[in-house]
């Protein structure tokens, strides 16, 4: 074999080997790039899911906070409305005639079956016919006065019957709270 042919054959083998190595490295590079692109896409998806979950949690937290603020404000408004109702009842009671006013207390004393005891008036009470009630129900009038918007307390031994305007209005509201709530919510 001639030297030229050997060189030519070696050149051909060299080019073939170079081409094989080049193709192999190109394939490895393409596989590496594909693997890294896949990892990048998986990482992006994971970050998207994580961000979406975080946003959902923050949205839920914000919604819960807003609902809590709304309910607190609603409760404050309802409480104010109930306080206004109580004040209106108190004003109506105070502005009623002496006859009507005393009839209310007489009905309350009858309901409680009062037969004797000590009557303690509130500081603001000035419409009750004390002499009439003391005589009819065998009550003694205390020199002391107590806090309140009207009415009185009857004490006998260990028994205390609170017939103050504040207590009666509070009991009236509590007894009718469901109906009041329905009115406040526009259900009636």
Curated annotation (Swiss-Prot):
SUPFAM superfamilies: V-type ATPase subunit E-like. Keywords: ATP synthesis, Hydrogen ion transport, Ion transport, Transport. One of its GO terms (cellular component) is proton-transporting two-sector ATPase complex, catalytic domain. GO terms for molecular function: ATP binding; proton-transporting ATP synthase activity, rotational mechanism; proton-transporting ATPase activity, rotational mechanism. One of its GO terms (biological process) is proton motive force-driven plasma membrane ATP synthesis. Belongs to the V-ATPase E subunit family. Produces ATP from ADP in the presence of a proton gradient across the membrane. This is V-type proton ATPase subunit E. The lineage of its organism: Bacteria, Pseudomonadati, Dictyoglomota, Dictyoglomia, Dictyoglomales.
